[in-house]
């Protein structure tokens, strides 16, 4: 994956998209800001609400307030997921030099079941992988550690082992996050795919390219930091470019993945009795 070429293409595509992409980005950011503000306002108002004089009334009011907060959080989360699906469509349109209509932001609301299902399944899988690594580290952390002035050689090796295990846990968690990279793009490009098929395709597509995706994120980190320093205002101009970079990376990985599948089909036709593994979906 040629990061430099992908970025050059994304820069040209974002420039061609022009004001339309910036306007859609502005609306997207304002809606996200409004959703976050709604959640903060709800937390503030419910925290100031008194349940009355008695303890039972206070407990009832506290329970009611927590329920309201949780409901608002769920609604905000769902709307945020669906809007992100819509902006992913915008990213593909910018990269492909297609028109960028405002209606594309609402595309997630046309497939709410698949969009939310994909987010939940991906979160569940990442959580399972993370806990599989973190649980041994948590167990080891619960073991009392001897003070430094009384440490034996075995205690020192135990601490070193613990630090290494924690580093490995962080590394594995990061790698797992790239395992399902691109699943949202696949969801939009393949409306006939189920949520599980999108996850499987993303896993196969990113195999052998996860370090490249990590380096791509690192290369875009300066732009993200600069946008944050401007209170997010710079995102209006740079978010279409950043999104187009990711869309370009997806299309490059997808192209290589489709070529791999095609080669596997050809080999199966030539050697029908031979077991050939590349297409594992």
Label each PLM-derived region with a short phrase.
Residues 1-281:
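Hydrophobic alpha-helical membrane segments
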């Amino acid at each position: 994956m040629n990061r430099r070429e992908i970025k050059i293409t994304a820069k040209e595509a974002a420039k061609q998209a022009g004001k339309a992409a910036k306007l859609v980005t502005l609306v997207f950011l304002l809606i996200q800001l409004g959703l976050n503000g709604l959640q903060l306002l709800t937390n503030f108002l419910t925290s100031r609400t008194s349940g009355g004089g008695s303890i039972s009334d206070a407990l009832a009011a506290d329970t009611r307030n927590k329920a309201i907060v949780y409901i608002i959080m769920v609604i905000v989360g769902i709307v945020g997921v669906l809007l992100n699906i819509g902006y992913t469509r915008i990213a593909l349109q910018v990269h492909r030099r297609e028109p960028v209509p405002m209606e594309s932001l609402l595309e997630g609301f046309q497939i709410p079941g698949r969009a939310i299902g994909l987010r939940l399944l991906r979160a569940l899988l990442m959580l399972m992988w993370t806990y599989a690594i973190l649980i041994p580290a948590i167990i080891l952390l619960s073991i009392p550690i001897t003070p430094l002035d009384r440490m034996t050689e075995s205690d020192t090796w135990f601490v070193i082992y613990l630090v290494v295990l924690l580093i490995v846990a962080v590394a594995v968690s990061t790698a797992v996050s790239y395992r399902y990279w691109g699943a949202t793009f696949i969801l939009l490009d393949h409306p006939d795919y189920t949520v599980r098929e999108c996850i499987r395709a993303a896993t196969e597509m990113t195999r052998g390219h996860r370090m490249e995706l990590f380096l791509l994120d690192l290369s875009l980190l300066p732009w993200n930091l600069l946008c944050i320093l401007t209170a997010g205002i710079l995102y209006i101009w740079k978010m279409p470019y950043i999104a187009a970079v990711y869309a370009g990376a997806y299309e490059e990985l997808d192209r290589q993945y489709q070529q791999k599948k095609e080669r596997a089909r050809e080999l199966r036709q030539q050697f029908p009795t031979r077991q050939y593994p590349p297409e594992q979906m």
